[in-house]
Amino acid sequence: FKTYLNFWQQKITTFSRKLLIKYSAIALTLSLIIVACNSDSQLNQTSVSNSQSSSNIITIWWNKGYLIEEDESLRKIVQDWEKSSGKQVKLSFETEDELPQKTARSLSTGNLPDLLFSTRAEYELIPRLAWEGKLADLSNVIAPVKDLYSPAVLEAVYLYNQQEKQRSYYAVPIYQATIYIHYWQDLLAKVGKNVDDIPQDWDIFWEFWKKVQEELRSGAEPNSDIYSLGIPLSDKASDTYYFFEQVLEAYNAEIVDREGNLQLDKPEIQSRISQSLDWITTLYKQGYIPPDALEWLNTDNNSDMLNRKVVMTPNPTLSIPAAQRQDEEVYFNQLGTLEFPNKPNGEPMRYIVSVRQAIVFKESKNQEAAQEFLAYLVQPETLTEYLKAATGRYFPVMKPGWEDEFWHDESDRHIAIATKMLTERPTRPLYYTRNPAYTQVLEEHIWGKAINRILNDDLSPEKATQEAIARIEEIFEQWE
């Protein structure tokens, strides 16, 4: 009986093991199926970024907007185009500081987006990439709407390709801005002044602001900490060189001619550069610019202005009033926006225009589709709605865009004055459009360094001018 019992125990044990193995195999199979399904789901979610080369999905990297409404407006444009075209878009927003770094990394790895829009790329990246032959020719996007652009806007994107020894449209204009002057109307009122008292003669204009500071510091309610002029002077901020480029324009110091040639060997140009450096550094030495302006980054003059530490400041966008748009009392009644005065020789000021641009890389995997999207985006009605979402921080690059009454509302003096500056006054782009070597002049902050050499190292304006000229000539030689 014991032998019989052992026999059946062995059978049962063997059967149990087989059963366990069988069901374990089934369980394993089911687990693999579940994992595979989950993996397929995850793959579908990430295929936009991981399968660019095998799909028609367009990758767009776009500068994150100053306001959330800007980003939402672009998302809607993308969604509308996806519906009408049947194509898909992977849209990524990056900050102003991160996007250039991300782009630099992508250029080294070859993992490029199909379309890029970066506010800083205009003068730090695009002219160099066009020169190196790394951008797609976008003439087909420009051609149908070419007559709608102003000459200055077209000039900004008509760039030189050193590889092909010719110029072409290697970028598409999206919006433009120039440099404005913002001031506190209520601070002027404290010293019995208003906008009608501000003169248009160059020297008298700046003397006016000096007197405002002196009266605010010595009036019935003295403010010993206030400065009249929030002018950036550091060798780190793009606001510094943008403002100084406008000062050079005021003094008619043409650094690069229309053929792209340096003019720095001309004594009259050297003298005008020295005059410009002497003018701006004298304002600081006289105590009308905050001491820490030598260290300011791009946001610092905005902060000092909004905190009422300065009476007025130049700024290359309308971001200062835009930041106060929700406070109607501040926006409409306390903050003001001004044009620059006439040039020192009495001529009307010509404004330097910054044109923000979108590009398609030559090695982009979906070039044709990216250009189709750009052609959709630059339709005047589409682009205008996008710009209006930014509450007028930037302005149209096309003539039909200006016809929208949004830009001509006289009750909004910030936008109305900016519109006048960009549509009724002479304008020109930065010098990089004439010669891409000038991008390096801006990147190296040559003018900010010259200002700091005068103020920190007691160099004369003449010697600082010669140092700046020597470095600029070196840069241009390297680009030949």
Cite the ranges covered by each PLM segment.
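Conserved N-terminal structural module of periplasmic/extracytoplasmic solute-binding proteins
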Residues: 1-8, 12, 16, 23-132, ...
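Conserved C-terminal helix/tail region of periplasmic/extracytoplasmic solute-binding proteins
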Residues: 52, 88-89, 189, 282, ...
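Short helix-initiation/N-cap motifs at beta->coil->alpha
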Residues: 93-102, 200-204, 292-306
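Hinge/lid segment of periplasmic solute-binding proteins
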Residues: 120-180, 221-225, 240-243, 251, ...
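Short, solvent-exposed loop/beta-turn-alpha elements that line the ligand-binding surface or hinge
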Residues: 137-152, 198, 221, 231-235, ...
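Extracytoplasmic/periplasmic solute-binding protein
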Residues: 160-174, 179, 204-263, 310
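C-terminal lobe and pocket-closing loops
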Residues: 318-331, 343-446
